[in-house]
């Protein structure tokens, strides 16, 4: 039997290397010059159970709330912004709207924290994706505390990883996106229908007639009874203010009915004049579960608010005429350093001055 010598083995090895190189070059040329891109697939959408953000391994952010496929060409991530959720229902609505508006203005992707999602998602059809906790823990965040009015500097923020803080709720941040904000804060259908059924079932207590104009009334009390006079040199809406506000509507609208909600319903029943037979105490006063009261207010035609973000958002979403409590602090109150009335209340809303005599 013929056995190859040493020089034959060397020749065979060299020829094998040459053929391997030629084969590799042909494959390489075919892959990268024939228009075929290599990419990594997104996760199976059927396994996405909650509105969390999905990042394709190519680095492209995908929206799980819409039908999608991963792009074949990688795109640079535009940045990740979020906001630290603080306060209760109305506060977090303001934080959500401000985050959405500022992120869009600066070309960034907005994410909300899981705790904010837990507060707002049971009530509204919100669409912003939820930030995964592990991303929140390890991201190289830079923080920015917002004051409660829009400033030019907020339109030119360069940080790609930005966590906003504070209690923004000024219309100056988001009013140019009003239709989008109203869409984000669309009630779930079962809440809207329940509120509509409640309103359609209301009758004037004396005559039994059906009202045609509904005025939502939100009376903020609770912790504000101590916070306003002791900390901010301010007052809350009193009996006289509510009487003036109701009379304003009675003078301009035929046979309105006033739908009262509050976190102090006992006070409302004892202090709001019901002698005309046009007041309904509809609120349940449950601060921990504001869904019913808020839905009722937003389905009304007009709004009377006292102070606070809950009343602001009820009025903003309801539309129509709005009466608010104006000048509710003394001129030297430190509250005016963080609160600008012209940035808090829409220009077309009507203010009625508060009675500050209890502070004198």
Curated annotation (Swiss-Prot):
Q: Which residues lie on this side of the membrane: Cytoplasmic?
A: 1-8
Q: A GO BP term, please? A: carbohydrate metabolic process
Primary gene name: FUT1
Protein name as catalogued? Galactoside alpha-(1,2)-fucosyltransferase 1
User: Which GO-annotated molecular functions does the record name?
Assistant: alpha-(1,2)-fucosyltransferase activity; galactoside 2-alpha-L-fucosyltransferase activity
Pathway, per UniProt? Protein modification; protein glycosylation
Please write the reaction equations for the catalytic activity of this protein.
a ganglioside GM1 + GDP-beta-L-fucose = a ganglioside Fuc-GM1 + GDP + H(+); a beta-D-galactosyl-(1->4)-N-acetyl-beta-D-glucosaminyl derivative + GDP-beta-L-fucose = an alpha-L-Fuc-(1->2)-beta-D-Gal-(1->4)-beta-D-GlcNAc derivative + GDP + H(+); a ganglioside GA1 + GDP-beta-L-fucose = a ganglioside Fuc-GA1 + GDP + H(+); a beta-D-Gal-(1->3)-beta-D-GlcNAc-(1->3)-beta-D-Gal-(1->4)-beta-D-Glc-(1<->1')-Cer(d18:1(4E)) + GDP-beta-L-fucose = alpha-L-fucosyl-(1->2)- beta-D-galactosyl-(1->3)-N-acetyl-beta-D-glucosaminyl-(1->3)-beta-D-galactosyl-(1->4)-beta-D-glucosyl-(1<->1')-N-acylsphing-4-enine + GDP + H(+)
Concerning PANTHER family, the annotation shows:
GALACTOSIDE 2-L-FUCOSYLTRANSFERASE (PTHR11927), GALACTOSIDE ALPHA-(1,2)-FUCOSYLTRANSFERASE 1 (PTHR11927:SF4)
GO CC, alphabetical: Golgi cisterna membrane
Which residues are listed as membrane-spanning?
A: 9-27
Enzyme class, spelled out? transferase
Q: Name one Pfam family in it.
A: Glyco_transf_11
Disulfide bridge positions per record: none
Where, in residue ranges, is this chain on the Lumenal side?
A: 28-360
Primary location class: Golgi
Record-stated family: Belongs to the glycosyltransferase 11 family.
Please describe the organ and tissue distribution of this protein's expression: Expressed in brain, intestine and kidney.
Glycosylation sites per record: 65, 301, 327
Tell me how this protein sits in the membrane: Single-pass type II membrane protein
Write out the entry's keywords from A to Z.
Glycoprotein, Glycosyltransferase, Golgi apparatus, Lipid metabolism, Membrane, Signal-anchor, Transferase, Transmembrane, Transmembrane helix
Q: Which organism is it from?
A: Bos taurus
Q: What is its EC number?
A: 2.4.1.69, 2.4.1.344
Functionally, this protein is described as follows: Catalyzes the transfer of L-fucose, from a guanosine diphosphate-beta-L-fucose, to the terminal galactose residue of glycoconjugates through an alpha(1,2) linkage leading to H antigen synthesis that is an intermediate substrate in the synthesis of ABO blood group antigens. H antigen is essential for maturation of the glomerular layer of the main olfactory bulb, in cell migration and early cell-cell contacts during tumor associated angiogenesis. Preferentially fucosylates soluble lactose and to a lesser extent, fucosylates glycolipids gangliosides GA1 and GM1a.
- Asked whether the UniProt record includes Transmembrane helix among its keywords, one would answer yes
Q: Which compartments is it annotated to reside in?
A: Golgi apparatus, Golgi stack membrane
